Amino acid sequence: YDITLDSRQVTTGAGFIAIQGAQTDGRRFIPDALERGAAVVLAEPFEAVDLGPRVVKVPDLKSHLGELAKRFYADPSAQLALLAVTGTNGKTSISDYIGQLLRLLGESAGTIGTLGARLRSGEAVESQNTTPDVISLNRQLADWVDQGVRFVALEASSHALEQSRLDGLTVHTGVFSNLTRDHLDYHGNLDSYRNAKLRLFNDFTPDRVIYNADDPSTRGAREASANPALGVSLVNASADVYVKVLDETPTGLRFQIHSPCGTAEIDSALHGRCH
């Protein structure tokens, strides 16, 4: 049995959750879900229409989705090391690099974001949103727990944080890449946009925080967390983690990383200091 926000995914015995979305009112599809065999429908309250005993109206249902998904799927994020990456730029690259590096170390790691949900680099998976809805997200994490996956790198978009798509997750590490003027049509102003990003650190209190020490807008992540925070810098040699570019060539980058774990020199096929 399963639960879903999409009536098209309902199968016999499943549960359908009907809420008012940003673009579509899921309550319009209650009859479709019932016809497909939904055992129960949880719905935000609506005008008095008797749709039968399988439809249960739940006040403020949207605010309970994270807890509902967490309990239904047996709290999968708590059984994983979940690394959530937010920022205007770099979420996809950083998440994918984390996944690749963990796999090279012999670990089982998944990535979720713009490129879809993947356990292997190059794996093509259709994705509608950078960050899936909270039900789909927990379903995916639970599936990976069953497969023995240990690590997941997740893109945490400002829209997802604002729309509670990550509610109920246990975040092991939070990463804040940078902040530039974007999505102001949705958030209204830069302060609201930054505050949406900072929800990852204020609301989820990750065990570890990594932020761009060269961008003042990301330092709120350090201030929001009582847990260890590492600032990464390309210009400040006294930063927690200092990256010194030694050479840039047509074949890639050569750089040194100075960190609390020691110093290493790396040759990379990546181009551009932004990486």
List each language-model region with its residue ranges.
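Short, acidic/turn-prone active-site loops that include or flank metal/cofactor-
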Residues: D60-S63, N178-D182, S233-A237
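Phosphate-binding loop of NTP-binding sites
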Residues: L65-A213, S217-P228, S259
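Short strand->helix junction
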Residues: A22-Q23, D182-H183, R273
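A short, glycine/Asx- and small/polar-enriched loop/turn
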Residues: V10-G13, G168-L169, A239, T249-T251
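N-terminal leader/targeting and accessory segments in enzymes
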Residues: Y1-E67, R71, P216, Y242-K244
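Structural signal for conserved beta-strand scaffold positions within catalytic alpha/beta enzyme cores
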Residues: A18, A43, K57-V58, A84, ...
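Short strand-coil-strand connectors
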Residues: D6, Q20, R120, H258-G262
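Adenine nucleotide phosphate-binding catalytic loops in nucleotide-utilizing enzymes
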Residues: P53, H187-R194, L198, E223, ...
